[in-house]
Amino acid sequence: SVEEMIESFVLRVRQAMNQVVVGTVMGGAQPVAAALDHEGWPEVVGTVAGDDTVLVICADPRRAGEVESRLRTMLES
C-alpha cells in the first residue's frame, strides 16, 4: 500500500507550486511512485521517479497542498 511505501522509503515531502517533491532513501523512489500511481488519487496528474526523488505533479497548487498534507500525515504516523 502507499502507506507502507511512505513509512518504508520516504524521508521528506515538500510542495513546490503544483508539484510535490518526495525525497526517499536510495532506490526508494520507484516503489513510492508506483504505489502513488496505483492509488489513483484524483489530485495527482502523474509521477516521475529518479533514484531517490519522486516528483508528484498535480493539477494546481491547492491540490498539491492536499497531497503534501496527506503524505506528511502518513510519514508522521
What are these model-predicted stretches?
Residues 77:
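Active-site phosphate-binding and catalytic loops of NTP-dependent enzymes
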